[in-house]
């Protein structure tokens, strides 16, 4: 055969050839290749001949390495091939008929699935366990009943198979049987053995009762309930996978860990979801199991769930849990805001409703009005600040004109201004309030007794006469500096008793009553 460099060198020449020439050239190269291969094979055969004898001698002495399989694999492989002779040889050489693979499957299980009646008979004669359980507690009768092999079911029942055997799903052979004839055979056999519904329920409860006894014995011995068992699973994993509600409740009562993980990172909720145990899913979630817990493969309980009913239940529980978390988060944030603003007056006031705020203001003004209703002190009050004077000047009503025919009704001694103006004011406008002083009721002047009966014209004339007799004051007068006998002596002594900027007292707008009545003292403020 041509070398690589030779082939590369002739490529330009081959590219210029016609189709027929290229075909002939390829056939020539192929003939050379076959010739070279035949020569190499001949040389290889000549070299192998002398070495065969030592290899056979080494094999006879057991010095060469060989592939050997365990007896369980060999027996199951022969039974699966329905090789009666080979199985008989294995059983005759001392191989146990109950050998199982990694899933707990025995040769008898496999033959019941494959419907090998003669092989089943041979294994039973060799002493095979007729009630052998695999990893999911399936017996050979479970396998035969599920597959509907009537003659195998009859053979197993005749050999003493357990009709009440329960697998990990809580199913008995008759629960898994869909064939009518096979089901009739099972029910007839159960009736012949006197099996009732009570005995069936008692048989279903046996695994859980056994686990409950085991848990109680561990509790009495003070053993750790969180200790991992096979494959790193805890007792709660086992109870969740098998649907043992009472056992799981007992474990949770003694604070079994809901977040314990097995070797695959599965929590008990993963196991309950994978094996479709709806009551256990609800129980674990109610005790705080994490619906978003992830395994080593980043799988949540919802990811490993294969049953639609369980999946729907998980989604429902997840939605409820998320809604509850959102509600709790809003409540915590509200409490946090209230706690942080407890020392801030502004935030507290903003949280008060309008009705509550109005009631608060009304209560404050009512208390202030009660204070102002008290009799004024006999001693002169000190002059108020400029703020009080400014406030009184701003709140003082304009003086009435004589040409104005409108007469203002006396309202609790207040003159002028809108009756609603000072309803919610912080400071009482004393410059527009005039009231007869009870302290001056004993004065000999008849003006005090007859004042309520003067007409408006008489009152104006008296005010004008008083203005001519008294020089204009520079500021507010005290009760001691006021001249006796003047109408101004009858007013309540207050720092800013209504004098305007020019010193003129305001004119009262009063109307004479139709019937004489004693003077009544009324509060100076209108209480709403």
From Swiss-Prot:
Compositionally biased region (Basic and acidic residues): 40-58
Statement: the UniProt record of this protein carries the keyword Membrane: yes
GO molecular-function term, one example from the UniProt record: myosin phosphatase regulator activity
SMART domains (UniProt xref): ANK
Region of interest (Disordered), residue spans: 19-59, 330-351, 367-421, 462-505
Residues with PTM Phosphoserine: 433
ANK-type repeats, residues: 70-99, 103-132, 136-165, 231-260, 264-293
Lipidation positions, renumbered (S-farnesyl cysteine): 525
Source domain of life: Eukaryota
Modified residues (Cysteine methyl ester): 525
Main location: membrane
InterPro entries, sorted: Ankyrin_rpt, Ankyrin_rpt-contain_sf, Pase-1_reg_su_16AB, PP1_Regulatory_Subunit
Complexes and interactors: Binds PP1.
Protein name listed in UniProt: Protein phosphatase 1 regulatory subunit 16A
């Amino acid at each position: 055969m041509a070398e690589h460099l030779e082939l590369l060198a002739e490529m330009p020449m081959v590219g210029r050839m016609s189709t027929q020439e290229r075909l002939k050239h390829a056939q020539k190269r192929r003939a050379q290749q076959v010739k070279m291969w035949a020569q190499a094979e001949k040389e290889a055969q000549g070299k192998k001949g002398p070495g065969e004898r030592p290899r056979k001698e080494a094999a006879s002495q057991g010095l060469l390495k060989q592939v050997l399989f365990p007896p369980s694999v060999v027996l199951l492989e022969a039974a699966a091939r329905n090789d009666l002779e080979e199985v008989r040889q294995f059983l005759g050489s001392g191989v146990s008929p109950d050998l199982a693979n990694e899933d707990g499957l025995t040769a008898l299980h496999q033959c019941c699935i494959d419907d090998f009646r003669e092989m089943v008979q041979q294994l039973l004669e060799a002493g095979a366990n007729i009630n052998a359980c695999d990893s999911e507690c399936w017996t050979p009768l479970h396998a035969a009943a599920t597959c509907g092999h009537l003659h195998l079911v009859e053979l197993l029942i005749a050999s003493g198979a357990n009709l009440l055997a329960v697998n990990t799903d809580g199913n008995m052979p008759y629960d898994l049987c869909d064939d009518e004839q096979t089901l009739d055979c099972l029910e007839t056999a159960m009736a012949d053995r006197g099996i009732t519904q009570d005995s069936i329920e008692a048989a279903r409860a046996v695994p859980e009762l056994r686990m409950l006894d085991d848990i109680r014995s561990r509790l009495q011995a003070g053993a750790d309930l969180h200790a991992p068992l096979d494959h790193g699973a805890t007792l709660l994993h086992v109870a969740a996978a098998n649907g043992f509600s009472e056992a799981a409740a007992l474990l949770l009562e003694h604070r079994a860990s809901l977040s314990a993980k097995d070797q695959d990172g599965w929590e008990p909720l993963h196991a309950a979801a994978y094996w479709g145990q709806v009551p256990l899913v609800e129980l674990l979630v109610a005790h705080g199991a994490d619906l978003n817990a992830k395994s080593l493969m980043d799988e949540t309980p919802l990811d490993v769930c294969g049953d639609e009913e369980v999946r729907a239940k998980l989604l429902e529980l997840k939605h409820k849990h998320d809604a509850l978390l959102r509600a709790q988060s809003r409540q915590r944030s509200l409490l946090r805001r209230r706690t942080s603003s407890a020392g801030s007056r502004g935030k507290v006031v903003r949280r008060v409703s309008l009705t509550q705020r109005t009631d608060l203001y009304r209560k404050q003004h009512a208390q202030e009005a009660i204070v102002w209703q008290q009799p004024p002190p006999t001693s002169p009050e000190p002059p108020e600040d400029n703020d009080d004077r400014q406030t009184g000047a701003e709140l003082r009503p304009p003086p009435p004109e004589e040409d104005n025919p409108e007469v203002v009704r006396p309202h609790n001694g207040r003159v002028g201004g809108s009756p609603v103006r000072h309803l919610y004011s912080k400071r009482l406008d004393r410059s527009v309030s005039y009231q007869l002083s009870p302290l001056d009721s004993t004065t000999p002047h008849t003006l005090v007794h007859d004042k309520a009966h003067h007409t408006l014209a008489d009152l104006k004339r008296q005010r004008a006469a008083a203005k001519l007799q008294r020089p204009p004051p520079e500021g507010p007068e005290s009760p001691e500096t006021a001249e006796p006998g003047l109408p101004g002596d009858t007013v309540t002594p207050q720092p800013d008793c209504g004098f305007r900027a020019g010193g003129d007292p305001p004119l009262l707008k009063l109307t004479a009553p139709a019937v004489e009545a004693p003077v009544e003292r009324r509060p100076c403020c209108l209480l709403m």
